[in-house]
């Protein structure tokens, strides 16, 4: 059962995207109104506004993404303050990077680290613009950080995927280390694997592309093409190895499309040693062969814009143009069933994004963003 927990009137225009910080109870939103807003996921505090980031982009902000903690979510706890940071991609073709400055005053580091969920989500923190990244020729459609915060991926209507490298501790400079031109049309979404340096991109050309570095760590290239959708692929997300349904020997990915379907793909690897005829430029890259494992039960009547895969339960949520939020669970390997369907989740408006999140009490919820400018929080 999907039940409304809370509704936030976040924006005066379309809410495009929501990002959840991997370790802090905080979300960021993106909107046509050119602003990004941050809210704390606290029922006791009634989901307060933490920060409003504006007056930077000239056009719609299409995507936001929080940088993961240093070393990744599963890294040992740090004995210093790991300050949160956020990237925002805009239709003005640029990406902004925001962060909190470390306090100038002296403080007890042990106390701050122990209470960072409260301290780092306080509305008293000042979020500052740290960088503006330029390179794309047209609208930036999506941004996403890799699991260690070293790489930021972006995609655009210019048909390209860019990978930017930075020092995750300082975020002082962003160097473009790859421009990937494999798609023939507008690229709608990019998404990193939760614990591997593998990137997926989804496109108006009806395909999903998978990218990885060569073994030497020098070049990024396309190592897999997922064909099967009969319309624009709006979104794709990898399954986390933390998921109770995950198999660590394979990779799985869920995708959402204009063709009304939600699909699960599974990867099988081929070693390049078996392909001596390949050019030397990709000789040391592992090719991934992907197959459709299953097509989830048909529910949506209009294009599906967003999917999310829970690392806690293994459940998948989808949402899109028909205003439905659908939750699926895996009854047995490769066999999915519908858990619940919620109609009119944003009234008569389309849903642009759905994502799993944890409240400050660690209960898992769904968060959706719609054309009505609302961000809705759902108990599942």
From Swiss-Prot:
Pfam families documented for this protein: WD40
Gene3D superfamilies: YVTN repeat-like/Quinoprotein amine dehydrogenase
SMART domains: WD40
UniProt superkingdom: Eukaryota
WD repeats: 10-49, 56-108, 135-175, 182-221, 228-275, 299-338, 346-380
Function: Essential component of the cytosolic iron-sulfur (Fe/S) protein assembly machinery. Required for the maturation of extramitochondrial Fe/S proteins.
Record-linked PANTHER family: CYTOSOLIC IRON-SULFUR PROTEIN ASSEMBLY PROTEIN CIAO1-RELATED, WD40 PROTEIN CIAO1
Protein name in the entry: Probable cytosolic iron-sulfur protein assembly protein 1
Organism: Candida dubliniensis (strain CD36 / ATCC MYA-646 / CBS 7987 / NCPF 3949 / NRRL Y-17841) (Yeast)
Record gene name: CIA1
């Amino acid at each position: 059962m999907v039940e409304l927990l809370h509704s936030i009137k976040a924006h005066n225009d379309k809410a495009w995207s929501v990002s959840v910080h991997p370790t802090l109870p905080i979300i960021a939103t993106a909107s046509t109104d050119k602003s990004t807003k941050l809210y704390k996921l606290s029922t006791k505090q009634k989901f307060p506004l933490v920060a409003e980031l504006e007056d930077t982009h000239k056009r719609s902000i299409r995507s936001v993404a929080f940088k993961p903690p240093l070393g990744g979510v599963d890294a040992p706890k740090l004995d210093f303050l790991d300050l949160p940071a956020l990237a925002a991609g805009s239709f003005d073709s640029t990406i902004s990077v925001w962060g909190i400055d470390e306090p100038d005053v002296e403080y007890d580091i042990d106390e701050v680290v122990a209470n960072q969920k409260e301290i780092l989500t306080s509305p008293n923190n000042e979020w500052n613009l740290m960088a503006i990244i330029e390179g794309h020729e047209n609208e930036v459609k999506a941004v996403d950080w890799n699991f260690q915060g070293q790489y930021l991926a972006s995609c655009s209507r210019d048909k390209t995927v860019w990978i930017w490298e930075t020092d995750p501790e300082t975020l002082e400079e962003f160097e473009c280390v790859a421009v990937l031109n494999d798609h023939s049309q507008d690229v709608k979404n990019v998404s990193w694997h939760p614990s591997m340096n593998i990137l997926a991109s989804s496109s108006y050309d009806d395909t999903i592309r998978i990218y990885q570095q060569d073994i030497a760590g020098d070049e990024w290239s396309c190592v897999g093409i997922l064909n099967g959708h009969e319309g624009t692929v709006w979104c794709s997300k990898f399954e986390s190895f933390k998921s109770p349904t995950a198999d660590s020997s394979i990779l799985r990915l869920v995708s959402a499309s204009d063709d009304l379907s939600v699909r699960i793909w599974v990867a099988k690897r081929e070693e390049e040693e078996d392909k001596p005829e390949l050019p030397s430029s990709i000789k040391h890259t592992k090719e991934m062969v992907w197959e459709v494992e299953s097509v989830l039960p048909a529910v949506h009547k209009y294009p599906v814009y967003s999917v999310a895969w829970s690392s806690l339960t293994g459940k998948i949520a989808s949402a899109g143009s028909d205003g439905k939020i659908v939750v699926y669970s895996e009854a047995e390997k490769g066999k999915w069933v519908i858990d619940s369907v919620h109609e009119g989740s944003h009234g008569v408006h389309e849903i642009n994004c759905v994502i799993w999140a944890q409240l400050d009490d660690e209960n898992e919820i769904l968060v959706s963003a719609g054309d009505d400018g609302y961000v809705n929080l759902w108990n599942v």
